[in-house]
Amino acid sequence: MDRNKEIFEESKKYMPGGVNSPVRSFGSVGINPPVIKSGKGAMIKDENGNEYIDFVLAWGPMILGHCDEDVVEAIKKTSEESIAFGASTKLELDLAKILCETLDNVDMIRMVNSGTEATMSAVKLARGYTKKDKIIKFAGCYHGHFDGFLIEAGSGVLTEGIPGCLGVPEESIKNTLIGIYNDEKQVEELFEKYGNDIAGIIIEPVAGNMGVVKCDPKFMRKLRELCDKYEALLIFDEVMCGFRVAYKGAQTLFDVKPDLVTYAKIMGGGLPCGAYGGRREIMENLSPLGGVYQAGTMSGNPIVMSAGLATVKKLYENPSYYDHIEKIGSKLEKGIIEIAKKKGLGLVVNRQGGMMTLFFTDLKEVKCYDDVKTCDGERFKRYFLHMLNKGFNIPPSQFEAMFLSVKHTEEHIDKFLEAFESFEG
């Protein structure tokens, strides 16, 4: 009996497409998805009892591995006396305090429930603070399913081949300007044309939602320069790369200070969580201090705060975790490149710390959305199915990132490289 198929088929009766997030349907790779039952460390198990070495990690959050003992214990302990109050708690102060005291350029922070909430709220705050309406986002970058972001978006929008999104009125995107990632001249032209109306730029400082694409430090400096010149805010969307490429996130890669930063994924320890923070003078424009209104019934709830606090403290107190992830990440990257070269396989590997993407292409580098769109989707599909059959859970999309955790070992990397070497292309 195929329990995976049985559960997925029944799910389709009650949930659109059988899923609660489109990429989980495995539609782009043409098979039914495994239905996951349990996970521990770097391993997960499906309903048929198949085990996989997991390189998806819930799309990034599980940097400590699945069911980390300290995170689980924190959740259990908190749940014995509190779940949700819709009121202030000491736990939300504890998490806010460690974040503000250990992260760069975060004087104050506001907790929300998801990455989408964090980014849409940060953009609203930027508009309220500057009294301007237009926002620049970059083609291929995904900032959640907020209407104003669903234009030239990455992630599932790109995976599912959706040119836009039905249900998004033209009015909702008229103030969204599209920049080209790593193209200084094009962004400069946007400011020359619309500069007095631009409230800010939102950018993934390490793009992960069109696959991993690195930001040129020179390009980032230009964004800061333009924002300063036109009195706009620079917003780093670190929902994915925050706490992943380094404890302090992608800010460690650039000599550039953002005005606002958004977080989610890792900071919630695997539970629904998000946050946005920045300079005090900006954050104090939020209600109840200022006129920018944002609220949430479940924001800062004790269970999530306890999981987030356990995760953040563990990462902060153990910098060697990032050394380990860099070591095995470098080994994986170099091994894949060496095998591809030996096979004569057109491949670009983009990696930053514990996030990585394989682009099947004859290009020498992949540095923007247009480069990503030229990649060989059919070859990726064959690669994905090959690796799944070898016992590896990797993203079912060429436009997503693979992730590493502190629980991945050199043995896991060796097994991945062995499986990749047997891929015939």
UniProtKB/Swiss-Prot annotation:
The gene is hemL. Pathway: Porphyrin-containing compound metabolism; protoporphyrin-IX biosynthesis; 5-aminolevulinate from L-glutamyl-tRNA(Glu): step 2/2. One of its GO terms (cellular component) is cytoplasm. It catalyses: (S)-4-amino-5-oxopentanoate = 5-aminolevulinate. Homodimer. Its cofactor is pyridoxal 5'-phosphate. It comes from Clostridium perfringens (strain SM101 / Type A). Gene3D superfamilies: Aspartate Aminotransferase, domain 1, Type I PLP-dependent aspartate aminotransferase-like (Major domain). This is Glutamate-1-semialdehyde 2,1-aminomutase.
